[in-house]
Amino acid sequence: MTQFESSRATVHIVGAGLAGSEAAWQVAAQGVRVVLHEMRPHRMTAAHRTGGLAELVCSNSFRSDDASNNAVGLLHAEMRRLGSLVMRCADANQVPAGGALAVDRDGFSAAVTEALDNHPLIEIDRAEIDGLPPADWGNVIVATGPLTSTPLAAAIRALTDESALAFFDAIAPIVHRDSIDMSKAWFQSRYDKAGPGGSGADYINCPLSEAQYHAFVDALLEGEKVDFKDWETAPPYFDGCLPIEVMAERGRETLRYGPMKPVGLTNPHDPATKPYAVVQLRQDNKLGTLYNIVGFQTKLKHGAQTRIFRTIPGLEGAEFARLGGLHRNTFLNSPKLLDVRLRLRAEPRLRFAGQMTGCEGYVESAAIGLLGGLYAAADARSCTLEAPPQTTALGALLGHITGGHIETIDTGPRSFQPMNINFGLFPPLADPPTRKPDGTRLRGNEKTIAKKQAICARALSDLDRWIADALRPAAAA
């Protein structure tokens, strides 16, 4: 064994949250030694309250457990098929929550901690890594989450570039393309400008009359806002990331001269009438199934967002893949910085997992930890593991992180933002269902349900094939 191979034989994982804990379990399950580094309880974050591994800082819900109709439920099912520790401990500590999987947070964390503590191949090191991991660690997973300590975050930023990490991220709502009413909206770029990769008709535009605009501004000003957490109050807003309601507070016309300016656009449905304001939506993924509302980062509560944004002409029936938000977060510009196996292009011995990579949510973080663990174990054993198909929830989420987004057409801030798993990340069905088993035609919501069920069935079938064709041979090598 060469010195390089020896340095890869032990996997060092920094951070024992959901992603790091799951990664450690997956690595050890492949017969590879793990050192799991966790700074708590010696150094706490502003959000954590215990030294337990995989502590749930906010909600105790893992969201829907419906693997036939819901994207996160599908992700649950895929992770269970891959022996996920997080899912096993969640199932063992479930509390009643209707169709959702919610857990006793203390029991869940205790179960994860006990499982990792008792595994013969896992060593838990309760110490802070206050900079880049030592150079002689040849196989590292960094899974330090959105509250990464300042010294480590600074070291990562120095290794990449100044804009690689966002400490106060702006999240705009994302809408499913097929829920937008195109009898009111239209495709057009301002002045028909075709940017890199664009056609000159790259935005969906929703026009507002003067009365509609002022009613919208009033609703923003009156809408209920989310309070900042204590640990979120120090960082300033980044330029260009002001919440839309803050812009509205600065003057009734501010939005008309900002993200809602109507210039360079003509409504083909009513070309003689110039819109007073225009809301633009920009394609958010390569598949063209998701569009984000440009400039609409917000701290409005979710109920207020859906109510207010559905007053926009063309968005009355909008279905949201993600609602907006603005909060302290640490995440990489992963499509630029990471390769398809989650390795840092600038230093491939470092692999990233969890919320730092640009996934959002407990289950998504654990899922990327699972994949990171499988990749690190394969590296330790000098094997190559192919990525899961993008038709699976795991593959779709990985695709979003490592390249499934598209760059913004205009110059300005990068477009990559954290996201939950949702059906908009999956490739379309080659042959969408149109009829019921009895031969009658599917209509309305029936068609939507059948489509989701077909996507879920395809995903589980393709995952089983990937396990048999790629994962098992790699593990046996």
Swiss-Prot record:
Annotated GO MF terms: flavin adenine dinucleotide binding; tRNA (uracil(54)-C5)-methyltransferase activity, 5,10-methylenetetrahydrofolate-dependent
Annotated InterPro entries: FAD/NAD-bd_sf, MnmG-rel, MnmG_N, TrmFO
Catalytic activity: uridine(54) in tRNA + (6R)-5,10-methylene-5,6,7,8-tetrahydrofolate + NADH + H(+) = 5-methyluridine(54) in tRNA + (6S)-5,6,7,8-tetrahydrofolate + NAD(+); uridine(54) in tRNA + (6R)-5,10-methylene-5,6,7,8-tetrahydrofolate + NADPH + H(+) = 5-methyluridine(54) in tRNA + (6S)-5,6,7,8-tetrahydrofolate + NADP(+)
Record's subcellular location: Cytoplasm
Enzyme class per UniProt: transferase
GO biological process: tRNA methylation; tRNA wobble uridine modification
Main location per the UniProt record: cytoplasm
Keyword field contains Cytoplasm: yes
UniProt KW keywords: Cytoplasm, FAD, Flavoprotein, Methyltransferase, NAD, NADP, Transferase, tRNA processing
Gene Ontology CC annotations of this record: cytosol
Catalytic activity, EC: 2.1.1.74
Chain residues that bind FAD: G15, A16, G17, L18, A19, G20
Cofactor(s) listed in the protein's UniProt record: FAD
Purpose of the protein: Catalyzes the folate-dependent formation of 5-methyl-uridine at position 54 (M-5-U54) in all tRNAs.
Family: Belongs to the MnmG family. TrmFO subfamily.
Protein name: Methylenetetrahydrofolate--tRNA-(uracil-5-)-methyltransferase TrmFO
Organism, as annotated: Nitrobacter winogradskyi (strain ATCC 25391 / DSM 10237 / CIP 104748 / NCIMB 11846 / Nb-255)
Gene: trmFO
